[in-house]
Amino acid sequence: MRIKLLLPLFALALALTLAACSNKGDQKPRPNIVFIMSDDHAYQAISAYSDHLTQTPNIDRIANEGMLFSNACVTNSICAPSRATILTGKHCHLHGKIDNRFPFDTTQVTFPQLFQAAGYQTAMFGKLHFGNNPKGIDEFKILPGQGAYYNPDFNTNDGKIRIEGYTTDVITDLTMDWMKNRRDPDVPFLLFFLHKAPHREWLPAERHYKEFTKKTFPEPPTLFDDYEGRGSAAREAEMNILLHQNWAGDSKLRPEVLDELGITPASNWDKRAMQNKYNRFTEEQLAAWNAVYDPIIEDFKQRYPTMTEKEQMSWKYQRYMQDYLGSIAAVDDGVGVLLDYLDEAGLSENTIVVYTSDQGFYLGEHGWFDKRFIYDESFKTPLLVKWPGTVKAGSKNDQMVQNMDFAQTFLDIAGIEAPSDMQGESIVPLLKGDIKGWDRDAVYYHYYEYPAVHMVKRHYGIVTREYKLAHFYYDVDEWELYDRKNDPMEMQNEYNNPEYAKVVAELKQKLDDLRVKYGDSAELDQKYIDLYNKK
């Protein structure tokens, strides 16, 4: 046991020594890094990717002045595991945070520790989602767990505090206060600007819900998907907007209205979720909320008795989009505030700005909300990078990059040696426009949280530009193959199609190779199943 504990400590000591030595003799000012991450922000809801749903002019500025990655993806599409992967540069089976329940292996070296040791000042504001004392961070104010949308609590260096206001705006204010008043102007900085929004249950700021509740959004062509042509995982997942999205907690009906109309709650926390929000509001906030949402509720009460299931689905989809996209609007506002300050303070030229999400999200595609699957809407994530003087403004990149690449990329940018056990690759060559040396032609994915909320089965898989092969396991043994070019919506599983037999064989071999490369195995699959069943 003593040897097991000493090895990570030795690795950290070695990494910190290398980090401290890496910048000796470096005459050029080391760049600042601003890492902006929202929660569950679908790439479909960023106008730099597609403007069919909403406009995000400030986030788009990062793309317009930098690079947009069209094939960025995650290793495990769920909040805390994704964040642990970003911090460690490793797949989940190595850092231990395989799902939102499992603990993070705190012996792991995180890249902020290396920045701190190399003389960077480090700060983190917003949602981390695991742990109350992030390693390698000089100053932090982070939401406990998921956090609230209004009048949030924060864990800080000095204990817990509560701040009145809308959480997205509060996080922006905390970030800007540090930038303007407590940042040492003579020392390079690593700043984490981490938003809770637009995570479920999607409460917009007052200025935005007044606007977005008046909008109507186009329905995706697969909103009424019947899952024919897919396996049991898609059919049995509990992510359908009509069946599984909460009437009160998500669609914002008053709990008593469900009783009045005889609506069965979608979950055992449906009514409680909305009541908790009401209890969180100040009197002024509640009055403003009711002034907008009460008429929506009254209109629904009049219409509901004659609504078909299809009409109910369409109504819930519109309510979902109004609040989800309304929540994003405040994130975009905050990004604009930060970008403006960087310009005004003369910091832009030596500051790398990154915008991403911890994963993608379903906005009605396949009738779903939430994430988890290897299918594109949850597997892919937005990634925009602005680096003046290095990244060509308005450029695009379609190479396959993953969130586990972020740690090594940031370390590379800062000239800090990366630990040898990190599994990603620096994307600095791609940022410089050099794709010749980038030879990644496939990525590995593994999702673990089952049986649990949303009931998305455990699966791992391989994704190439042309195909996607996934193995669903635990209570099933099913394979799925999708032709990404000919079936971009992933509607038809071709695994048993004889025409794809050669493709399946090649991908299975390549998948086995990736599992070996990244240290994953059937033994680890069973280990995590056994540990999960003990909890």
Model-derived features: where do they sit?
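Formylglycine-dependent sulfatase
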Residues: 2, 8-12, 16, 21-473, ...
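Residues forming the ATP-binding cleft of Hanks-type serine/threonine protein kinase domains
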Residues: 485
